[in-house]
């Protein structure tokens, strides 16, 4: 009788934790009113499309990115009025910056494995980057009204001394701005042992506040703070551009693990184009903020629906039955994000992206808030 041994497989060399993971799933959205991914819903005018096409057609795509990326960094520094003593680095979206931070902070001389800490529910990439790079991740639940639990956060900071503490401002998916006083206390607690705090301002174009003002007014107190933003919500989600600024000494070290030419020359050209036409995107953001208030008012008037305050281009809404509401909207051609299983605090919650005025009217009609 011949015994059959299982042949060796290349999968044996793939990490077991990776094999146990699920790839990030993107919902099928063709033919739908797409209100699931916090994208800017506005397209460029035909005139701007033609101008951008001319610029991209003239790009030397046979050459590696070089001075064009430097031009973009310079333009972004001017755009944000970067504070003295700060530097800025670019990423292929903020996702790459999150990965680079984890890579740079994996181990130190005193700790074989460092820790990343973040409030939950929050952006999934904080935990995923820690897992993929081999760091420990500690999640600290928010309060029931989605505020930072100062006592729990400070206890976690004291216990684990995380290399990086992420604070989204405003948060995803809850869309709220956390109390600035609480954030200052957390930053100070991390600074006491040298820990970094990353303020993620992905939704800054729609927010009433920015932590950049704090960095300017109190540079020493924020010397351990890195500010991260993306141009996705600016209107360039398809381009993949993110940037991070902070103390030059810190940025210079993290920039060492960035792959060369991580931002393509085409992406850099589109970024420069967008900054040149920043007023167009600012006007789009203004419309989105007005529409957000219209949606909030209409949703508040609906029975059995609880919308939460938003400083982003999304609204978190609690329904009596989120799964039923999600399927009903989908049956009417409207795609939103069902976040009800992401965290116990999000039970029966859907996240609605603020769309164009017409898209938002369709959403409200589907929810029974607008006459057919």
What are these regions (language model features)?
Residues 4-96, 100:
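N-terminal small-domain helix-loop-helix segment of the aminotransferase-like
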Residues 35, 165, 200-202, 228, ...:
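Structural scaffold positions in well-ordered secondary structure
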Residues 45, 222-301, 306-308:
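PLP-dependent aminotransferase class I/II
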Residues 60-191, 198, 203-221, 284:
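Conserved core of the PLP fold type I
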Residues 245, 316-318, 353-355:
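Short hydrophobic/aromatic beta-strand micro-patches
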Residues 288-289, 299-333:
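Conserved PLP-binding catalytic core of the aspartate aminotransferase-like
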Residues 331-332, 341-372:
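PLP-dependent enzyme catalytic core of the Aspartate aminotransferase-like
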